Every structure is written in structure tokens, then in C-alpha cells.
Amino acid sequence: MTTMITLRRRFAVAVAGVATAAATTVTLAPAPANAADVYGAIAYSGNGSWGRSWDYPTRAAAEATAVKSCGYSDCKVLTSFTACGAVAANDRAYQGGVGPTLAAAMKDALTKLGGGYIDTWACN
């Protein structure tokens, strides 16, 4: 009986050690490719239609894709970003925001608009 408990305990300790090592490896792993190396954009039309793009090699390419995806001749870029972008809306207006995280981009857009809600977002 004592041998069985000892083996179970050794196994549990070994599993815990492997789990800790795996968690440390995941925690310390380098971040994926720099978000600053790619661009995204969000474009809006006066009728509320929008287009988004992300993971483009240049700002111009990201903006052109967002405008094209929007699909209307009056589409204009509201925000361009390297990490995350969001667009806040209310009954009267739309406002773009950017940030290093989605939460930061949403907060930026809502702050610039003075309230409202998040209509769309994208991150690289």
C-alpha cells in the first residue's frame, strides 16, 4: 500500500513539474511577428457600410483594401493601425481609435467620440 501511494505521489510530482515547465515555456515564449510590421485599416461610408483590412505590408495597401471592401464611392478611411483599431458610433457620428490592444483601441474610439458603442474592430 505504501509503495502504491509513493508511486502515485511521484507521478503527481512529475506531472506537476512538466506542467510548470510547459507553462513557463509558454509564458516566456517570444511574441509573434511585430504588429508594427503589418498594417490594418477601417473605412466607412455615409450609409454606415464599412470595410476592414489587416495584416497588410503597407499602410497604403491596408487603406485601399478597406475602402474597396466598404464597397461605396464615398467610403473613407476612419482609422489605420499597426496593432488594433476600432470604430465607435452613436446616432450622429463614427470615430476611429487605435491602440496596442483591442481594449485600448476600443477605449480610444469611445473616448474620442464621447461615448456610444463599438461598431466594428480589427487587429493585426
Curated annotation (Swiss-Prot):
GO cellular component: extracellular region; peptidoglycan-based cell wall
Keywords associated with the record: Signal
Keyword Signal: yes
PTM characteristics: Predicted to be exported by the Tat system. The position of the signal peptide cleavage has not been experimentally proven.
Leader sequence residues: 1-35
Keyword set includes Oxidoreductase: no
InterPro entries: DUF4189, TAT_signal
Family: To M.tuberculosis Rv1813c.
Record protein name field: Protein Rv1269c
Organism: Mycobacterium tuberculosis (strain ATCC 25618 / H37Rv)
